[in-house]
Amino acid sequence: MCRTLALLASCAAVLAVAPVSAQRPTTDPLEPGLDTVITPTRLVQALSDVPASVTVISAETIERFGIRSIPEALRIVPGMSVIHATGPDYQISYHGTNTLSPRRMNVLIDGISVYRPAFSEVIWSQLPVAIEDVQRIEVTRGPNSASYGPNSMLAIVNIITRNPNDMTLGLGAGTLGSNGLRELTARTALRLGETAVGVTASTSRDRGFDSLTQDTAGHDSLRIDRLAIRSQSRTGTQSTLALQASVARGTAEIPFIDNFQQSYPDRRFEDFYAGAQWATQLAANHELSVRLDHARQSSRQSWRTCLPTVALLPEMFALWRANPRYANEVLAGRVPTGGTPTDNALALAAITAIQALGAGALAPRCVRANQDVIQRRLDLELQDTYVFSDRLRVVGGLGLREQSGESQTYLGGKQSSTVRWLFANVEYRPVEPLSLNVGGYFERNSLSPSTFSPRAGANIRLAPGHTLRLVLSNGTRSPDIQEQRTNWSYRFEDVTPPLNGSTTAFFYQSRTGPGNLKSERIRSREVGYLWNAQSMGLLVDARVFDDRLSDLISERTNLAGLVPTNAGSVRLTGAELQVNLRFGSEWNGYANYAYLDNREATNILERTQWSRHSGSIGLSRDFGGGWQAAVAYAGQSGNGYQQSAYGRTDLVLSRAFDVDRVRWRATFGLQRLDSPLATYSIGSAEPLESRRSNRLAGYVRLAVTVP
């Protein structure tokens, strides 16, 4: 089975790609001007019918406000916590909580998850999509495990790219800016019979921060190159085939890993994604689709470090494995007691080895360490959508995933798991003012016990343009391979001078996974209100919520830290307001605010990323003659443990003009930080700091579009 899936995925990669969403958002016919979305339930629904609060960031908004990256776009989302820790490192989570592991939010690109299976992470700076290819971003604010399963526990971000059928013949764009910013993007699209193909290549360079706690020289630049191919084909009168493949590769500078390092532990990465979706219209009211996705994410990280010889002794490695307390006692120069006879024998062997070294026990030996990781996932999913009547629609499906992580350091080799799932969502309108949504997602995971995530929502149209929303939902996050099955140890090579005649050695500390972790859980309650005043160009979405998170894996994961447990919990309550404005053809704007209360946390780490107050506001105007200007502000109060406040003002001025049917657009952007210093927590006694030398930053961008 796995070999067959792998072969199919490889074929899909060769063929090229396209968005894999069979249902494209349109406009709600009942309320003209009101967007429809697909992410919350997998059904195309009007915002007034979805059982969730949704933020939609359009390509127009991205262009108007000079947004240059997806992490920066998410600052618009009410309640979204965005911390730019270092140049390549963004810590992003809806409602924050644990900054050490912001792994409770799923991220999709055209419905394909980029969530990494072995470490439950999303590396935002390595997303394989150029901002120029983004058609819209749909953010479901609240648990969405009922539609997409575990890991969509707090929210889900769905990045929807441009359909090749809608792309122009060519696009070229270049950006120059402060902090060494250099960006180039080129895109072309063409039609080959019944197939439309789009190809985008981009490259980006950024110097990062000017100074870091762990490196005053600010060694945190990012260099990344991307290539994406998408295709959309008609394979019959009622069927389509969408294919996609993308790669992102580059180098992320890392300033620090250990106190004895002699070289920078920079990380070289290469991420590959491929997907195929075949969809067929079996009848006017019945659609079937099959999706196959493959991802391979490789990270190579090695550095030179010089450690005291005693830390490399095999006797110390064996003693730590048996009894870490004994090992610490021996290193402190004491004879440990209270252990088993085996512990005592291992302690005696370690003490004898240390005594044999004499003063050389503290002499440095230089080694080459690595944290290389390869993560893979292969998904096959069948989805069936059936419209019984104007009052009843159903979507359901099943899927299979094979996923693995391979790392000699973190996993002692290769660890794999298998995931199977079933899901369904039902939309029912018993009477015209009322829309009901009920859904659930059942998952069986070889890593942890099975889970079921249900959701029920009721949308009541009180009057034209006024909708009351009530939502009850439960969500989960499955423990990842590293949390559950870690076999963490450092095997050093090129030991200089050799130790006992060997050029390899193990660091004395190690860790194994508990193997008995269960899924994290959330129980969410929401009351929302949507006001669509089309005549005023106004759309307002307000909600209050009460989220109770339990069975959290809160502990800091490192060699000498606590063993991971499900002992954590926290309660998140608050309110959010989202306003979109459009006054005629000249004015556009938005205003968002979130109030969040993080309480009853059992572990301080669950309070390392949260802001009681956060929000954003933006306004743009078209002046005619191609001139356009925008101003925006985003900020958060930074109430988390060791977390600083954040605020930034953006000014954008652009001019679009045509020359011989070719559209040119020149953009100038200026940014001002409230503070050049950002602090964040890694669970240690002191916060880490990242600093800019100047509050002001600017950029210029020139884009040309060939129709």
Where are each of the predicted segments found?
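N-terminal Sec signal peptide and the immediately downstream disordered periplasmic leader
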Residues: 1-67, 71-77, 189, 234, ...
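Extracytoplasmic beta-strand/coil segments of soluble accessory domains associated
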Residues: 39, 46, 71-113, 135
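N-terminal periplasmic accessory domains that precede
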Residues: 70-73, 90-96, 105-110, 124-127, ...
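Short acidic/polar hinge/loop motifs at secondary-structure boundaries
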Residues: 113-141
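Transmembrane beta-barrel wall of Gram-negative outer-membrane proteins
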Residues: 176-205, 215-252, 266-290, 388-394
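Membrane-embedded beta-barrel scaffold of Gram-negative outer-membrane proteins
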Residues: 289-293, 297-301, 461, 469, ...
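Gram-negative outer-membrane beta-barrel transporters
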Residues: 390, 394-395, 429-433, 537-550, ...
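C-terminal beta-signal and adjacent terminal beta-strands/loops
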Residues: 476-477, 653-707
